[in-house]
Amino acid sequence: VFFGYATKTDGETIKLEGARNCLYWSKDMRGFMGLASIGPSKDCRIGPRADIELRSITAVLDVVAEAVKRWEDAP
């Protein structure tokens, strides 16, 4: 699961700026969509930032403001 900033989300590839990867999400997320609706908790493992290009995307989710803050603040 990736979090980042995109200006275009249609097509075969999506470029994300400042992307972060969730390496592990904890049970309290109740699935990957919890990462978009509440953001990662202290028990999740989040990787460092990088600009990336993703291919063959299966889903793009809007992230609520509170969840964005938690992604940005994750260690």
Regions flagged by a language model, labelled:
Residues V1-P75:
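Conserved RNA-binding domains used in RNP assembly and mRNA/RNA metabolism
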